[in-house]
Amino acid sequence: MHLPSRRTFLKAAAAAVAVPSIPISARSARAIPPIGRTRPSHLKLSLAAYSFRDELDSKPPRMDLFEFVNFAADMGLDGVELTSYYFPADVKPDYLHRLKQHAFNLGLDISGTSVGNNFCLPAGPARDIQLALVRTWIDNAAHLDAPVIRIFAGNVAKGDEEAKAVARAIEGIKESLPYAAEKGVTLALENHGGITASPGQLLKLVKAIDAPNFGVNLDTGNFHGEDPYADLALLAPYAVNVQVKTEISRKGKGKEEADLARVVAVLRDAHYAGYVVLEYEAEETARTAVPRHLKTLRSLIS
């Protein structure tokens, strides 16, 4: 299936944008066309099921996805992000449809889902499994009416070369995109360590992939340079989904509380439109911390 080029859509708009006086690194980052957003930023609030991983993963589970959706509804959210890890093994369409109906009845969108793939693997059965996993979750996302799936690029295996791993990751994403387009699903590549640990590494992949149903899943806690907020600003124009962490860690320093107001300002400056998904990972129990952080985010995006 031929995917129309985002560059085709944005060529005229990109040509009309004046280049401000910005650092060389930022100019290089903007060499590929960002998503063409000119309207004021429009932000909606969602919560990732991963925030409750301790309850969803416990043996036996202290929460299931239906109960997670109930919690999100009690919080007055716009949507929920249903992480793939917490679905039943070999989940069937009937379960997905019941979960979608449950969220709909409570006034919630399913803002997205996510899959833990590794496209850096060389050709062979292990790589085929990863490609099939993403394809399965494209199907599942379509059943859920989830518009976006968070995907990973992967990691460089011991003895492998980063350039080769990057090439394989690019090929894996390109191979998956046409099927995702057929199902009406966008693939969002996260900055998640490995070959996407830095803005430059992530942009190397993004620059190589030109499709309207592809973008960045911007995780605000996953850049660890000297100025993570500046790094986020470089990638925000390419974001199709945003996962907000309540902590950041700078190069050579430990964790510190994230400046959520600054994070939201970065998104607004980029005219980001879409879901802001709280993905809580800090030490305080989610039951007590998540409501407080949602209240803060709601006040910032309203």
Range-by-range predicted roles:
Residues 108, 185, 270-274:
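A short helix->loop->beta-strand "cap" motif at the edges of active sites that frequently abuts
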Residues 2-143, 164, 171, 181, ...:
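N-terminal pre-domain/capping segments
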Residues 47, 110-112, 150, 189, ...:
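Hydrophobic residues in well-ordered beta-strands that form the structural core
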Residues 77, 146, 239, 272-273:
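A structural motif
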Residues 83, 152, 245, 278-279:
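Conserved residues at the C-terminal ends of beta-strands
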Residues 141-160, 183-192:
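Active-site groove signature of glycoside hydrolases
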Residues 246-251, 275-284:
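Active-site clefts of carbohydrate-active enzymes
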Residues 79-80, 170-266:
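Acidic/histidine-rich catalytic cores of soluble enzymes
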